[in-house]
């Protein structure tokens, strides 16, 4: 059983099951769940900038004063770029890398896709847009003992309800990483942002084994994730250190699937596609 979670009141509005959230809502939620990291980084800038500015004024040291001003400008510039980067990932431009991922996997037509996630249905909506004839079976796979290593995960889960607005999107819940879908019933499975939160050493391996089970012969596995690189570091800050590295995803997928392909989107998202053996 997962550890019980105490109800938290959020000031960001929750989604409504019968209405699809807008890209603006998803971008706003990404900013909201990142608020702790933004505040943590801000405190570092203030801890250096305020004393530096005070020294410059009190001791009439122009260099120290202007250094504090420059630090503030750098901080604001980084914040602006981070907000812009989050918009490109979670706002309207996000559909571009999902479309590219689907093309990388040569997926089209009346296919059945399992969207495997940790509590956000954004990926299911985007897949339904890019694949207008597809049926999307969206499965909440979060079933981790204890607290998440990232508090943002629970915020994400609290704010979005399983959708009922699209008849081509059907929501399910996994049971300890066992998927409630029949063997060889899907043409593709898709893993998206947040997959790195599923622990290795058992849980992640089981989930990908389940993905193999539900795939038809020759079925496709698709994955898009944040990378551990300078671009993502500027957008997310030091929290990006806990994501799975691109080379580790590549090795993990090649151990389980054939013909693994990789591409990098302009939104700093790593894209992978492979084929069931």
Language model: regions and residue ranges:
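Short alpha-helix
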Residues: 240-257, 262
């Amino acid at each position: 059983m997962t550890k019980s979670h105490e109800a938290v009141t959020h000031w960001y509005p929750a989604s409504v099951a019968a209405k699809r959230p807008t890209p603006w809502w998803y971008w706003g939620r990404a900013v909201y769940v990142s608020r702790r990291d933004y505040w943590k980084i801000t405190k570092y800038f203030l801890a250096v900038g305020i004393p530096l500015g005070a020294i410059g004024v009190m001791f009439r040291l122009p260099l120290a004063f202007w250094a504090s001003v420059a630090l503030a400008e750098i901080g604001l510039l980084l914040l602006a770029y981070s907000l812009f980067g989050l918009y490109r990932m979670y706002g309207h431009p996000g559909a571009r890398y999902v479309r590219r991922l689907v093309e990388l996997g040569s997926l089209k037509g009346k296919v059945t896709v399992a969207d495997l996630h940790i509590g956000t249905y954004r990926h299911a909506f985007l897949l339904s847009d890019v694949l207008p004839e597809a049926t999307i079976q969206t499965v909440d796979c979060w079933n981790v003992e204890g607290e998440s290593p990232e508090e943002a995960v629970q915020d994400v889960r609290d704010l979005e309800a399983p959708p009922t607005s699209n008849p081509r999107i059907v929501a399910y819940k996994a049971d300890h990483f066992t998927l409630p879908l029949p063997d060889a019933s899907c043409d593709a499975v898709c893993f998206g942002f947040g997959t790195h939160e599923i622990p290795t050493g058992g849980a992640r391996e089981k989930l990908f084994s389940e993905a193999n089970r539900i795939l038809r012969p020759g079925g496709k596995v698709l994955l898009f994730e944040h990378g551990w690189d300078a671009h993502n570091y500027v957008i997310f800050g030091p929290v990006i250190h806990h994501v799975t590295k691109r080379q580790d995803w590549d090795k993990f997928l090649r151990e389980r699937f054939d013909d693994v392909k990789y591409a990098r989107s302009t939104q700093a998202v790593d894209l992978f596609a492979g084929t069931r053996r």
